[in-house]
Amino acid sequence: MIVLDASVVVELLTNGALAASIRRDLAARSDSLIVPHLLDVEVVSAIRRLLAGARIDAHRCAQLLAGLAALPAERYPHTPLLERIWDLRHNFTAYDAAYIALAEATGAALYTCDEKMRGGHHATVVVFRA
């Protein structure tokens, strides 16, 4: 299994600079994809920022939202992870800790574009960067 965080999903949806590398890696592994329910809200927030910054238009927003809805990842509730999310509070935001806690609980690798997600926990982290 692979946990995708919001940075990776935004890269994939927007076909960002790292999207091809992420797709190649995912295709080579053929693992199932999992995400905390939080992912959808975080990605919608990122899409909103892209629109507010005039980097995309309303039509593109609709396309990205449809792509998010179609993301072939199983959504996991974060309620069972709350204790671990809290334990990680000294090094991570609750948002980041939700992805880490899910990866730890399932033994999945965590895919991210955020270097700060490395270390301070027991999850395996794969960081994509330019």
Regions found by a protein language model. Give the residues of each.
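Short, well-structured N-terminal submotif of metal-dependent ribonuclease cores
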Residues: 1-38, 50-59, 115
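Short, flexible helix/strand-to-coil boundary loops that buttress conserved ligand/catalytic motifs
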Residues: 13, 47, 121-122
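Glycine/charged-rich beta-loop-alpha catalytic/anionic-binding loops adjacent to active sites
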Residues: 24-30, 66-67, 82-83
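Active-site-proximal, substrate-binding regions of enzyme catalytic domains
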Residues: 46-72
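Active-site neighborhoods of divalent-metal-dependent phosphate/nucleic-acid chemistry enzymes
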Residues: 71-113
